[in-house]
Amino acid sequence: MRLGAQFLPEKFDEYIASVRMAEQAGYEFAWLVDSQVLWEDVYVYLTHGLDSTERITFGTAVTNPLTRHATVTASFFATLAGLHPGRVALGIGRGDSSVRTMGLPPARTGQLEQYVRSLRPLLSAQTAKLDGADVRLRWLQQDPGVPIMMSGTGPRNLRLAGALADRVMLYVGVTPEAVQWAMRHVGEGARSAGRDPAELKVSILCAMHVSDDHEGAAAACRWAPAACANHIADLARNNPRHDMPEVMVRLLKAREAYDYYTGHLDSSAAHTAYLTTELIDDFAIAGPI
C-alpha cells in the first residue's frame, strides 16, 4: 500500500513544513486542492512544494475542465515535470468548490472526457484538436511523462476514468461494499477501452485520523463524508435509477445543507454536525490501528 496526503494551499510556512514531514514519514504523494476562491493558488504551492522536497510526488486532487483551460493545464504540468522529472502527477475531476463558489455546476462527463482527450496529446508533445483548431505546445519537444489521475464518485465518471486514466481516485468511502461497487464500474470502463483493469493504479480518497479515542478521531474526519455527500447528491439527482450501495444511500438520506464558504473540508463546520460516528466510519479511517 502506498500513502498520499492531501494539502490545502494556505499558510505557506506550515504547508512547506508539512510536506517535508510527509516525505520524511514515507508518504509517496502530496495532493493539493485546486479551489481558487477558497484557497491560494495551487500552481504556486505545487512549485514550492517540489522545490522544498526531494522525492515525494506532487499533484492536484483535483483540478477541473472549467476553471483551467487545457492548454494552461498542459503547459504548467509539462513545465513542472521538466524541472522535476518523475515527481509530477495531474489529478482531474469534474469540479466542486472551484466552480460551485462561482455559481456554476460541475463539468459534465462529456466535458471531462474531451478535456482529458485534449490533454493527452498536449502533454505528449503532439497536436490536439481544440474547438476545431489544431493546437500544440510549441516549446515542448518530448513527452515529460505526466500521469493523469481521474477522480470519480458516480458510475459514468468511474467508467470514464477506467477508460482513460493512468490512476483512478475513488471518492465513495472506505467500505468494501462501496469500493467493490466503484471498481466494478472502473473495470467496465477499462474493458470497453481494451484495457486490463488489473493494470490500473487505484487510490481511495478518505480522511484518516489515528488515535486511541475513536469518537474523537471520527469527529476530526467529519469533513470527508460531508463533502462526499455533495457528489452523492448530484449522482442521485442526475441519475434517479442509480444503483449506488446502501452506505452511500444512508449518507444521502442524512445529508443537510452545505456551505462552501464557511467550512469546505472543515470538520468543525456547522454543516457537519449531523454526521454520526457510524456514518463517518463509512468514509474515513478513524481510531486505533
Where does each model-flagged region fall?
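Active-site mouth loops of central-metabolism enzymes
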Residues: 1-13, 63-70, 142-153, 208-211, ...
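N-terminal beta1-alpha1-beta2 module of alpha/beta enzyme domains
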Residues: 1-60, 146
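Hydrophobic faces of well-ordered beta-strands that scaffold small-molecule active sites
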Residues: 3-7, 30-32, 57-61, 88-92, ...
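Short, acidic/polar
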Residues: 11-22, 73-76, 152-160, 289
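Acidic (Asp/Glu)-rich catalytic clusters
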Residues: 19-24, 46-57, 77-88, 162-163, ...
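Conserved, mostly hydrophobic/aromatic
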Residues: 26, 49, 80, 119, ...
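Active-site-adjacent beta->alpha loops and helix N-cap segments on the catalytic face
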Residues: 38-47, 174-190
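An alpha-helical appendage that flanks or caps ligand/catalytic pockets
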Residues: 105-139, 179, 184-289
